[in-house]
Amino acid sequence: MNTLQNLTLKMDRQPTIRMKPDKQLDCSLSQDDGVWMMASSFIIFTMTAGFGLLESGRVSSKDEVNCMVKNVFDVIFGGLAYWMFGYGLTFGDSKHQLGRYVGFGDFFFDPERVSDDDSTDEKGISYSLFIFQMSFATTTSTIVSAGMSERIHLKSHCFISFFITLVHSVAGHWVWDQEGVFRMMGVVDSAGCSAVHLVGGVSGLVATLYLKPRRNRFAKNGIRTVSDPTKAILGFLMIWWGWLAFNTSSNYAVTHGQWTEGMRSAVGTILASAGGGVVTVIITRLSTKKIQMDMLIDGMLASLVASTGGCLYFTPWQATLVGAIGSSLALAAYPVTEWLKIDDPVGVFPVHVVGSIWGMIAPAIFVYRRPMNFGPPECDFQTSDEINGLLYGGGFYLLFLQSFVILVIGTYSAICAFIILFLIHHSPVGLRVDKYTEELGADLIEHGLAGFNVMTYTIEKKLDTKTLSAVLMIIVRWRAKAKLGAQRRKKIHDSGSVAPQQAESVEMNVIHRRH
């Protein structure tokens, strides 16, 4: 805490960005800016579909639909959490004793109840800011969802989506709110590299470690099942499209000359992914003699994550280099996850943890804070050109600050994720699915998609003798249990000794005890 206070005091003497989304809307954001944020949020929400396709395409076909449903739940329950508490925790009133660490107020967001004197424009800007920030918040829970693929109850996922959104909201206050502790210290995080990707990545890593690997994932003859590579790549393309809005709109506005920063961010984002793509193709070709689908996707996603930290500042050559380095670091983490036997189905660790760490370090090296217009001078929205990266004479202050933010937010996310998982695990809801659900697939157990499940599973395994025998054995055992249970319930019911409902309960208990 003393270190944090000393850093805060030191930064109080430094010029920094001053941007407050609520209190000075009349002199900073116009109707055009509100439309810009609203339209961008619509595009960002398409990333949810992309994440769903990517995740379902990279897991076993017996869990494809379940993965898509989880991503739907991320928006449902994550969005509800952000409306109820998240927005207030991030952008609520900071004029209190703990104002630098958490916002308070604006819970159950509703601009209509604040003041009847507010203009229509002010209310419109508030609505557009809410939907824009909500699109970022639900992305965080989607990242965590990917780390738990094929192992978690759907009902448990509802609670995780809700609470992870609140974890993100507090971190967002530190980084984005005008009075946030790291914002006051001068942190550079243009588009949620720490508040979205580091929070989501670390939480997802904790989740996959807590749940332990999928059955037979690291067995002697275990394999990584991929149900539909085409679907996974289509999902990546949708994410890539959404990421352009994710980064470009993080300047909040297109007026007062601010549109230039958005255009710089758009060019930097696409060039970062291009640089990362070139490096990824070279690495996967040299290491495997092929262009591996999962390595291509993860390498390019890591380059996009790396670009989020300083996307509003990076010049084209800087963005290309940052993306290339981000991809190489992420792919270097691949063997580490296998060696440590971390079952990470969609690459949450290399993409979002490694990518976000480098994405936060990169601005400390490359950023040159040229004067940027964020509204009229009387609004105090000008940025500073005095705290630059190492390449531009900024010294080590920004590098130390960015590293400190990584450490604090990473630790905070890990602790919160563990507490959430622990409480759900030891509650009546439960956390991990049983072994039969995992074998048969959540599509069958949770959604009743038996025919589709069995058909695609056999195609996925190419119907070799061993696989066919295993699949048939599982189906036969499941049907035998169902038939035996029906016969026993009928016999008990005919004898009149036990009510049918009680007989069913007794039978299920017998089956669970046996297995």
Curated annotation (Swiss-Prot):
Entry's transmembrane regions: 34-54, 72-92, 124-144, 156-176, 191-211, 226-246, 266-286, 291-311, 321-337, 346-366, 381-401, 404-424
Listed InterPro entries: Ammonium/urea_transptr, Ammonium_transpt, Ammonium_transpt_CS, NH4_transpt_AmtB-like_dom
Single GO term (MF): ammonium channel activity
Any one of the GO BP annotations: ammonium transmembrane transport
Top-rank taxon: Eukaryota
Any one of the GO CC terms: plasma membrane
Record family assignment: Belongs to the ammonia transporter channel (TC 1.A.11.2) family.
Main function: Involved in the uptake of ammonia. Implicated in aging.
Name under which the protein is recorded: Putative ammonium transporter 2
Organism: Caenorhabditis elegans
Record gene name: amt-2
